[in-house]
């Protein structure tokens, strides 16, 4: 078996778990705001944390919550048809993660950002929420990553 491919898959799986936990943490943060450090402590013992890329989880949560969300919501509003405050909290969390990755993580290909966001929205969001997430992240990727397309 190709060792580098296996290692890349394992790293990708660990990041996917980190994103899942970040969606849950950011959902909690929206419902009951508090310091991002509390989110890290709260989720440190999560059942899936041993399978997650803990550093990536922290980068997502800290990168979004540390700014208080207002800056991210202002940026997100450029790509949505309604105010971010009116979004379902799950889709809002997924979109914040996607926007963070598109803006600050050029090491993550835009297609991965969109695929992961759609998958999380399918798993945790409303019935057709994944379609909305797909459209918004696609719009954001066109503007934020024009050279990748």
Locate predicted features.
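N-terminal interaction/assembly modules
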Residues: 1-149
């Amino acid at each position: 078996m190709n060792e580098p491919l296996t290692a890349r898959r394992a790293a990708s799986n660990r990041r996917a778990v980190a994103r899942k936990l970040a969606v849950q943490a950011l959902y909690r943060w929206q419902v009951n705001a508090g310091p991002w450090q509390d989110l890290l402590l709260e989720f440190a013992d999560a059942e899936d944390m041993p399978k997650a890329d803990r550093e990536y989880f922290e980068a997502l949560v800290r990168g979004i919550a540390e700014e208080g969300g207002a800056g991210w919501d202002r940026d997100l509003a450029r790509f949505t048809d309604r105010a971010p405050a009116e979004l379902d909290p799950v889709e809002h969390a997924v979109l914040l993660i996607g926007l963070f990755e598109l803006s600050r993580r050029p090491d993550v290909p835009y297609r991965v950002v969109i695929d992961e966001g759609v998958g999380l929205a399918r798993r945790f969001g409303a019935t057709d929420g994944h379609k909305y997430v797909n459209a918004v992240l696609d719009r954001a990727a066109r503007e934020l990553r024009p050279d990748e397309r």
